[in-house]
Amino acid sequence: MGQKIHPVGFRLGITQEHQSRWFAEPSRYPELLQEDHKLRQYIEQKLGRLAQNNAGISEVRIERKADQIDLEVRTARPGVVVGRGGQGIEALRTGLQTLLGGNRQIRINVVEVQRVDADAYLIAEFIAQQLERRVSFRRVVRQAIQRAQKAGIQGIKVQVSGRLNGAEIARTEWTREGRVPLHTLRADIDYSYCTAKTVYGILGIKVWVFKGEIIPGQEVAAPPPSTRDRDRDRGDRDREPRRRQQQRRRQQFEDRSNEG
């Protein structure tokens, strides 16, 4: 049943980590869980896809220590979150403290997403934005898959459901490139879901990204170099013999100078 279960929840404790890491008394657990939902909802409203300044928020991780809350905001555009001179992150902290009330200390750590085109949520968000602009879903999905493949992933699957291109009858279409082994527990699979609100109704977008297998005791293999890196390395190799010739000529000139 690997095709049906949530890929992230299926791998918690194996290859995936919890987004909220804290312990609480059973009586306080519902209250703190609701606080986590409010924190993520507030950050999504201020910096998410529908905000004026879209920072490309991929994930928000929450840790609690006594009266202190540590937030780790993974974003594609950290400059938008931090703001000029740190004004943006300070305004975000003040807004969160006002939302929760009380003497809560909130620490915000902004982490930049290294491979934006390989992040499942950012891919789903990109597809949703294009669908809301009435772009053909097949063109959008093909473009998103090509960008993800250039980022060095091993497989991707994209599913779009709803009244596609304004059709009278809703349907579901999906496209897969490469391997997406949902039954393999050691597979590092990133999954996300996003909705696009169009004039014809709501479209659901699901994205599965397979980044490789995580085997205990082995380091995670680095992603393959991009086309730009390969071209730069090839240029360095082409220039290397020329540098050696210049060094040899310089050495011969110095030898003649010493003889004279």
UniProtKB/Swiss-Prot annotation:
Organism expressing this protein natively: Trichormus variabilis (strain ATCC 29413 / PCC 7937)
GO molecular function: mRNA binding; rRNA binding; structural constituent of ribosome
Pfam families per UniProt: KH_2, Ribosomal_S3_C
InterPro entries per UniProt: KH_dom (IPR004087), KH_dom-like_a/b (IPR015946), KH_dom_type_2 (IPR004044), KH_sf_prok-type (IPR009019), Ribosomal_S3_C_sf (IPR036419), Ribosomal_uS3_bac-typ (IPR005704), Ribosomal_uS3_C (IPR001351), Ribosomal_uS3_CS (IPR018280)
Role summary: Binds the lower part of the 30S subunit head. Binds mRNA in the 70S ribosome, positioning it for translation.
Similarity comment: Belongs to the universal ribosomal protein uS3 family.
Record-level GO cellular component terms: cytosolic small ribosomal subunit
Protein name from the UniProt record: Small ribosomal subunit protein uS3
Quaternary state and interactors: Part of the 30S ribosomal subunit. Forms a tight complex with proteins S10 and S14.
Gene Ontology terms describing biological process: translation
Biased composition (Basic and acidic residues): 227-243, 251-260
Domain KH type-2: 39-114
Chain positions covered by the region annotation Disordered: 219-260
PROSITE patterns in the record: KH_TYPE_2, RIBOSOMAL_S3
Alphabetical UniProt keywords: Ribonucleoprotein, Ribosomal protein, RNA-binding, rRNA-binding
